[in-house]
């Protein structure tokens, strides 16, 4: 398995073990900044699909003997190399043991991407809309998490590194927050929290208040909503569901079609389809907003 993975084995007469030297010569793309995690400051480097190159990016940032790499192979057919990275003095031994135990349970034939092993790392039996396993393509972000005692899992063939454990509030954090004044970083983070709760609760509040407690709304707003509802054939609930479905369809189309066309699809979906639906009287303008 080591030879098939590109290692050279160094044997010495009289010893019952050999040294495995990483001399892989596989072709891989150059290091570049990940498009999904842009930053104003900091490094412009991102992980690539070569595991050994990714490990070197981590080692260059954490020059400590406390940093440990544990290599293993998963996948009966693919024999994919996977590496656990952690600081021995800071990592939780209990969590580390659970992660290793869960990885040993994986019985897949092929592992082509780090997403294959995420279901095995999440808490079993606890239903949550938010994953307890984080993901990043930035070496500096990953090294910051490792320095906090987290466990990083890198999979050969993908630039997406996994972080265990990962908490809900970390979805609102960004490495740029640590490069600015604490006042601005705090304001930006609270702005993210507010935007999250508005985007998740506002549609339901709009439908609930407009349908069951319209007296709460000011008179001018209530009159505009009543005028919009009177010109559409659907209820507010059905309008909201339709708009959410259209948004998900346009988002999926923008992700899957070629990149030059993705921006055009977003513009067409937001402007043309929305304006046409309102003009035709299928949905109301307040609901679309």
Regions flagged by a language model, labelled:
Residues 1-239:
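Cytosolic regulatory modules rich in charged/polar residues
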């Amino acid at each position: 398995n080591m030879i098939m993975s590109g290692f050279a084995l160094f044997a010495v007469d009289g010893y019952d073990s050999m040294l495995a030297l990483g001399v892989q010569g596989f072709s891989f793309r150059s290091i570049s900044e990940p498009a999904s995690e842009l930053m104003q400051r900091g490094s412009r480097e991102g992980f690539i699909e070569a595991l050994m190159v990714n490990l070197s990016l981590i080692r260059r940032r954490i020059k400590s003997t406390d940093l440990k790499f544990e290599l293993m192979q998963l996948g009966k057919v693919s024999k994919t190399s996977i590496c656990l990275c952690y600081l021995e003095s800071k990592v939780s031994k209990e969590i580390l043991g659970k992660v290793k135990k869960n990885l040993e349970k994986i019985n897949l034939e092929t592992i082509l991407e780090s997403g294959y092993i995420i279901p095995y790392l999440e808490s079993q039996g606890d239903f949550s809309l938010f994953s307890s396993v984080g993901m990043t393509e930035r070496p500096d972000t990953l090294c910051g998490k490792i320095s906090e005692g987290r466990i990083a899992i890198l999979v050969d063939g993908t630039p997406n590194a996994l972080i265990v454990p990962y908490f809900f509030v970390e979805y609102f954090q960004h490495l740029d927050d640590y490069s600015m004044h604490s006042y601005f970083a705090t304001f930006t983070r609270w702005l993210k929290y507010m935007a999250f709760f508005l985007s998740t609760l506002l549609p339901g509040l709009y439908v609930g208040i407009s349908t069951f407690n319209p007296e709460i709304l000011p008179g001018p707003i209530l009159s505009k909503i009543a005028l919009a509802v009177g010109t559409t054939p659907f209820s507010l609930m059905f309008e909201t569901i339709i708009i959410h479905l259209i948004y998900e369809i346009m988002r999926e189309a923008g992700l899957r079609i070629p990149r030059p066309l993705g921006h055009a699809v977003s513009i067409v979906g937001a402007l043309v389809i929305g304006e046409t639906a309102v003009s035709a009287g299928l949905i109301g303008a307040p609901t679309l907003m």
